[in-house]
């Protein structure tokens, strides 16, 4: 399973990634994004993931702003 993590706190992102790998070692974290801006820039090219883990409050705004700018059909866990 390919996963994208959108989280502005590096330690939290690393902790989530470690938990996911303990659950299933085959999970691939294919991208980390720490801001609305960086996520929009990359996700606008298409989402090549099976699941998104997204923090609601990012340093430059709410993560909901990402999905108002980019269409994403991938399941999202907030």
State where each predicted segment sits:
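Non-catalytic signal-transmission and effector/linker regions of two-component phosphorelay proteins
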Residues: 1-2
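Conserved acidic carboxylate
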Residues: 7
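Two-component/phosphorelay signaling modules centered on CheY-like receiver
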Residues: 10-31
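Active-site residues of response regulator receiver
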Residues: 55
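The feature encodes the CheY-like receiver
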Residues: 59
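Acidic catalytic/metal-coordinating carboxylates
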Residues: 62-65
